[in-house]
């Protein structure tokens, strides 16, 4: 309970978020909870299953009876309160049938569900579903063929409307008539019978019948069904049941994608709260692209997206900045690539790779975060580097143009309108909808550039932290890069850790026994720190560094202007090996690879 209270930041019993927190807690206990050891035969059982078992046992023992009760008032979409009536001789779909349930579970097991954690809810729904009314006495709908007093209830047939889409256009253009028989549907949807017999019995052209069958085979099975989480206990599970009852296994659904709802400023949209934003006015004020992106970037699939107008304005500003860059950088020519150019092009490949992987898993928020925020951060750093070296736009236009070209392609599925405009600004004559999703260019990965820029970023951050803590305003900052023998030690440790050897004693012994690294016997603390440095590094970074040799002094010299400008100080750079270095406080001795020492005065 405390975890949930902290998660929702609840301070008092009157907090309106308390109800939502309670629902979250009960839901978590119900779907994830296990029965305690003191519950006898139910011990260790899932709470959801235990509830049904307790009910079943109590009914069998005549210790309980069933009372039908509405959990809350039922209202029509027009606002009128509904009266629930029990009907006699009503028709039901028998979702209780154990064989049908078993097939439904088989279908779920063979399907891709996104996100995968929704699988538990589908299985649970299949287990508890029982007979469900499939017909009613009033309202719009199709008459039940074998009992015309009844009208087919919408959720009983609408869950296979994808199949109807195949023939809908032929109904609308009057190619089909009302004299369709069972043989027609058996052929078009199931492949039973012959096109010739169907055409003859229904007075249709052979060409139309064959065309509908081919189109059905093209579009079926359903590759992906997208809907809200609130439809898992009904529409989406009926979708599974009804498909497996009608179609062969080869035509069963392949994927279901479930999404959350959209909240407004952290609250559910409702008329009573007065927080509904009409779509037309929102688009008119903020643009369709900004609204689309702000909702998509707010949450992953199963989470509720918290829509705020401040977020929309922020997204719009970011999109307009990208648009401005597209107007500014149109030349394709690239001059000789500098260190920062190689870095931004390498970073671009990482973003393409990560975004593509995220999109393949329908991690839309993660994808947009890469394209919007990560690339913004990268470009801001790149332009800082450019400004510090006083490079003009002509010298970077080709590189920036490559970045924009790729970025706009990745942005287009989410913000199609402004992406089309930007694509044209970049000199493309055809629509961006005809452009391919960008591929990773392996030749532009530059791991030396990646690590070099990370080294500079970390140097700047370390210096800023020291200044913040000490509250000094240095006029001069001395940077000391690690001695060459320390690099030998670092590489040796890195190789051993990469091989799975992390024991300090084993590493120390290997270093002391190697003439190139034996100096470490006087510096065991440094070895411990290097081991910690390497183990705190992500695995992919370790693997890159095994193959790298960085000249730290050269890297720092290249960024001297930027770091000095950011810190408002003169930067003086030495190698620890330099006998003529200025080192009044003997700081150089603590320098380690990728961890330069600093002295300020």
Language-model features: locations:
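Charged, glycine/proline-rich intrinsically disordered loops and linkers
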Residues: 2-41, 176-213, 497-547
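Alpha-helical recognition segments enriched in aromatics with Gly/Pro capping
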Residues: 1, 123-303
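C-terminal low-complexity, glycine/proline- and small-hydrophobic-enriched intrinsically disordered tails
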Residues: 309, 313, 430-601
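Core structural elements
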Residues: 81, 129-137, 317-325, 341-354, ...
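Residue patterns forming the tRNA-binding/recognition surfaces of aminoacyl-tRNA synthetases
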Residues: 1-151, 158, 267, 278-311, ...
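A glycine-rich phosphate-binding loop feature that marks nucleotide/adenosyl-phosphate handling sites
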Residues: 69-80, 146-150, 255-262, 299, ...
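Acidic, turn-prone loop/beta-hairpin segments
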Residues: 334-356, 369, 373-462, 480
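Structured, non-catalytic alpha/beta "coupling" segments that mediate domain-domain communication
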Residues: 53-95, 311-326, 409-425, 577-599
């Amino acid at each position: 309970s405390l975890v949930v209270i902290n998660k929702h930041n609840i301070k008092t019993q009157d907090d309106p978020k308390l109800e939502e927190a309670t629902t979250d807690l009960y839901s978590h206990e119900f779907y994830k909870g296990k029965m305690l050891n003191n519950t006898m035969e139910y011990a260790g059982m899932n709470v959801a299953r235990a509830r049904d078992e307790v009910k079943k046992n109590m009914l069998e023992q005549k210790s309980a009876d069933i009372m039908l009760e509405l959990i809350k008032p039922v209202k029509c979409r027009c606002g009128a309160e509904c009266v629930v009536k029990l009907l006699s001789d009503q028709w039901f779909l028998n979702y209780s049938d154990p064989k049908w349930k078993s097939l439904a579970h088989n279908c779920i097991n063979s399907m891709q569900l996104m996100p995968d954690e929704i699988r538990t809810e589908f299985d649970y729904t299949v287990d508890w579903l029982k007979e469900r009314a499939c017909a009613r006495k009033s309202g719009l709908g199709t008459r039940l063929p074998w009992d015309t007093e009844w009208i087919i209830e919408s959720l009983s047939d609408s869950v296979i409307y994808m199949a109807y889409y195949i023939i809908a256009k032929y109904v609308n253009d009057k190619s089909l008539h009302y004299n369709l028989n069972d043989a027609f549907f058996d052929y078009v949807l199931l492949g039973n019978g012959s096109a010739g017999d169907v055409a003859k019995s229904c007075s249709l052209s052979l060409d139309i019948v064959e065309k509908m069958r081919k189109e059905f085979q093209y579009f079926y099975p359903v590759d992906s069904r997208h809907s809200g989480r609130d439809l898992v206990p009904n529409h989406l599970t009926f979708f599974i049941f009804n498909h497996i009852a009608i179609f062969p296994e080869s035509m069963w659904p392949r994927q279901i994608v479930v999404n959350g709802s959209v909240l407004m400023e952290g609250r559910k949209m409702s008329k009573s709260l007065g927080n509904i934003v009409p779509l037309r006015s929102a688009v008119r004020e903020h643009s369709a692209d900004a609204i689309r992106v702000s909702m998509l970037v707010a949450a992953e699939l199963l989470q509720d997206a918290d829509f705020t107008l401040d977020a929309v304005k922020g997204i719009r500003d970011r999109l307009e900045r990208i648009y401005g860059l597209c107007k500014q950088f149109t030349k394709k020519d690239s001059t000789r690539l500098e260190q920062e150019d190689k870095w931004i092009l390498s970073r671009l490949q990482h973003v393409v790779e990560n975004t593509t992987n995220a999109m393949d898993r329908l991690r839309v928020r993660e994808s947009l975060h890469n394209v919007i925020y990560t690339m913004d951060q990268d470009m801001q750093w790149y332009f800082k580097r450019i400004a510090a070296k006083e490079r003009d736009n002509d010298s970077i236009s080709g590189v920036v143009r490559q970045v924009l070209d790729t970025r706009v392609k990745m942005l287009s599925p989410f913000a199609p309108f402004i992406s089309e405009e930007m694509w044209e600004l970049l000199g493309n004559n055809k629509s961006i909808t005809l452009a391919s999703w960008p591929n990773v260019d392996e030749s532009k990965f530059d791991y030396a550039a990646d690590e070099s820029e990370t080294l500079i970023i970390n140097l700047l951050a370390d210096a800023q932290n020291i200044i913040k803590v000490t509250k000094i305003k240095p006029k001069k900052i001395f940077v000391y890069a690690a001695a060459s023998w320390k690099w030998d030690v670092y590489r040796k440790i890195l190789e051993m850790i990469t091989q799975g050897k992390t024991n300090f004693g084993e590493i120390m012994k290997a270093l002391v026994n190697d003439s190139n690294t034996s100096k470490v016997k006087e510096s065991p603390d440094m070895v411990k720190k290097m081991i910690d440095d390497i183990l705190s590094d992500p695995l992919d970074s370790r693997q890159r560094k095994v193959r790298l040799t960085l000249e730290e002094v050269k890297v720092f010299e290249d960024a001297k202007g930027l770091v000095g400008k950011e810190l408002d100080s003169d930067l003086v750079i030495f190698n620890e090996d330099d006998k003529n270095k200025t080192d009044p406080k003997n700081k150089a001795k603590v320098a380690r690879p990728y961890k330069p020492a600093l002295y300020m005065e």
